[in-house]
């Protein structure tokens, strides 16, 4: 019986240590650029059922693990973000974000974002988005993989059935590829922006 508690204690201590290291890394190198950085405290662990019923509250930053049973919403999230239905962040996300249905963030500086239906990033995204639908303001140095990918300004790779970018300095691979601000705005299979 005592061995079970020892294993549990070791797991909790490991998670706490990882979370504190991520928190320090987030403070030292990944300074949030989003306007939502409220200067609130940062927690290594957050548990959410839905906005308004979560610990800690929405105004906190999470630097470690955020577990959203249904839907969770916080300012900035650094490290691992897991949601049963949806993850919502008003500010910046860095690390890994996985949701059953939907992810929504303000911006990212290095994020693997995976969702069952859609990923949305309001501003600048750096990283990899994987979902049937990916929508982002600006991708600089990233990939979008899905059925439909949409971005305003793009540097990287879009891989999907339909890819749309207003401006692109990257590659699109898919059935229909659209770069609005291009000499050849619509091409099948491959479209390159310069």
State what each model feature region is.
Residues 13, 17:
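Acidic, glycine-enriched catalytic cores built around paired aspartates
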């Amino acid at each position: 019986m005592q061995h079970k508690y020892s294993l549990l204690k070791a797991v909790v201590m490991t998670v706490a240590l990882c979370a504190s290291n991520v928190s320090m890394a987030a403070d030292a190198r990944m300074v949030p650029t989003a306007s939502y950085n409220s200067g609130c405290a940062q927690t290594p662990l957050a548990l959410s059922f839905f906005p308004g019923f979560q610990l800690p509250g929405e105004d906190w930053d999470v630097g470690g693990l955020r577990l959203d049973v249904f839907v969770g919403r916080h300012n900035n999230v650094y490290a691992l973000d897991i949601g049963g239905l949806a993850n919502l962040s008003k500010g910046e996300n860095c690390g890994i974000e996985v949701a059953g249905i939907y992810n929504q963030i303000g911006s990212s500086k290095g994020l693997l974002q995976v969702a069952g239906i859609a990923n949305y990033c309001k501003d600048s995204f750096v990283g990899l988005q994987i979902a049937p639908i990916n929508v982002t303001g600006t991708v600089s140095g990233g990939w979008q993989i899905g059925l439909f990918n949409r971005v305003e300004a793009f540097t990287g790779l879009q891989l999907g059935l339909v890819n749309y970018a207003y401006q692109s300095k990257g590659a699109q691979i898919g059935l229909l590829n659209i770069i609005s601000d291009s000499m050849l705005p619509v091409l099948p299979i491959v479209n390159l922006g310069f």
